[in-house]
Amino acid sequence: MVNVLVVGDLMIDHYVWGSCDRISPEAPVQVVNIKNETKRLGGLGNVVSNLKTLGSEVGVISVVGDDDVGDEILELLKDRGAKTELIIKEKGRKSSQKSRIMVAHQQVLRLDTESVCEIGVSDDIISKFENILSGYDIVLLSDYGKGVLSPYLTKEIIRITKKSGKMVLIDPKGKDYSKYSGATLLTPNKKEASEALGFGINDEDDLKHALKMLKDKFKLNYSLITLSEDGIALLDEDVKKFPALAKEVFDVTGAGDSVLATLGYCLASKMSLEESIEIANLAAAVVVGKVGSADASWGEIENLKSKKSGFERKIISLDELLRVDRSGKTMVFTNGCFDILHFGHISYLQSAKKIGDMLVVGLNSDRSVKELKGDNRPVNAQSDRASMLAALEFVDFVVIFDEDTPLNLIKTLKPDILVKGADYTGKKVVGSEFVREVKLIDFVDGKSTTNIINKIKG
């Protein structure tokens, strides 16, 4: 069982559902005829709700007002099975509630009731946090700028968590990210990152600069920016994009909470960062297809994943590939840039498939191709190259690697047979010591990406 400790701003998302077919005679405003009202956890509470749906145990540290809304928040948390004994009621504080007037599944007005000021019980929270941290796998901070995560408290939580060797993930707020310095990663969207860094993110160069600046300036372990309809971007050695999967977007409320919760759950479950981002991306796609703050179940995530086209399902991470059932099957591995797919590639891959039962193609990332072939390559981006390879019926899986050689990939995967071109005759093949056998296949004469590029250039 995964145990997640969350800290931040709790609130209630109050929805007033109605219809509208006339304008008020008193003022030029819509008259909404109320049909129904619903209340659910918002802010940090939505992170909790998402975590519980994923199957996590959740401990909650926060501050609410000593009022009816605060009581409702505590009851809703208890109903979700969260641990609420560490939530402090502060006299004079007004608990947060956001009331949204909804007509035809669209917001027409929002009314907020809340206090926006720093809490006065930071030292009490730090003491509680230190006492219970050992019982949790990971820490998530959800900052909505209402005052719970003051600079002092945030810095202390990061310091204590990192000292314990655990990860701390933060959904940030505001323009000053200095209080988040030293966190494992932040999950800002493009607008938030742009405001915090002081420049617009308008193209790929801006995005890479922003990711690098976030990581370096705030001493993060990893740098990530959510891109709304464009998915999620991660800075490794180069920018890696995880495309968005939502087919219809009804309401983006709470999508950031779902990303934070799902990332936290997956990382606490010892999944790799890339696989965790893939799943968080799916969860966000599920959530934006609903109206109001919502969460994504494993069933919904798997259902959306299964709706990816057949060949797209063949493009997987190394972690996913290691879980593929290989019993009784001979795994054949080959690799390359496959920049401009041509008949020579087709013939080579068909021959490789005939050697065994399962053909895995290791594909050089864009960064890797550029390092090997020069600044003008690749011609086609890694996502396009991977999709074209995966669309071939004789290719079973495509896995992208970022190094110059597939040595680490082969060492981890340990395929049965390693296939290379006949030009490797008499040469040592990278990774050969980790496979049962190396097979060399003749290329089709005159067929190469370089020749095609030169022919196009004239």
UniProtKB/Swiss-Prot annotation:
Gene Ontology MF terms in the entry: ATP binding; heptose 7-phosphate kinase activity; heptose-1-phosphate adenylyltransferase activity; phosphotransferase activity, alcohol group as acceptor
Pathway: Nucleotide-sugar biosynthesis; ADP-L-glycero-beta-D-manno-heptose biosynthesis; ADP-L-glycero-beta-D-manno-heptose from D-glycero-beta-D-manno-heptose 7-phosphate: step 1/4; Nucleotide-sugar biosynthesis; ADP-L-glycero-beta-D-manno-heptose biosynthesis; ADP-L-glycero-beta-D-manno-heptose from D-glycero-beta-D-manno-heptose 7-phosphate: step 3/4
Protein name listed in UniProt: Bifunctional protein HldE
Example GO biological process: ADP-L-glycero-beta-D-manno-heptose biosynthetic process
Assembly and binders: Homodimer.
Gene: hldE
Covalent S-S links between cysteines: none
Active site: D257
Lineage, broadest ranks: Bacteria, Pseudomonadati, Campylobacterota, Epsilonproteobacteria, Campylobacterales
Segments for region (Cytidylyltransferase): 333-458
Catalysed conversion reaction: D-glycero-beta-D-manno-heptose 7-phosphate + ATP = D-glycero-beta-D-manno-heptose 1,7-bisphosphate + ADP + H(+); D-glycero-beta-D-manno-heptose 1-phosphate + ATP + H(+) = ADP-D-glycero-beta-D-manno-heptose + diphosphate
NCBIfam families: cyt_tran_rel, rfaE_dom_I, rfaE_dom_II
Enzyme Commission number(s): 2.7.1.167, 2.7.7.70
Binding sites annotated in the UniProt record for ATP: N189, K190, K191, E192
Organism: Campylobacter fetus subsp. fetus (strain 82-40)
Family annotation (Pfam families): CTP_transf_like, PfkB
Region (Ribokinase): 1-311
Keyword terms of this UniProt record: ATP-binding, Carbohydrate metabolism, Kinase, Multifunctional enzyme, Nucleotide-binding, Nucleotidyltransferase, Transferase
Gene Ontology annotations for the cellular component aspect, listed alphabetically: cytosol
Described purpose of this protein according to its UniProt entry: Catalyzes the ADP transfer from ATP to D-glycero-beta-D-manno-heptose 1-phosphate, yielding ADP-D-glycero-beta-D-manno-heptose.
Family, similarity comment: In the N-terminal section; belongs to the carbohydrate kinase PfkB family. In the C-terminal section; belongs to the cytidylyltransferase family.
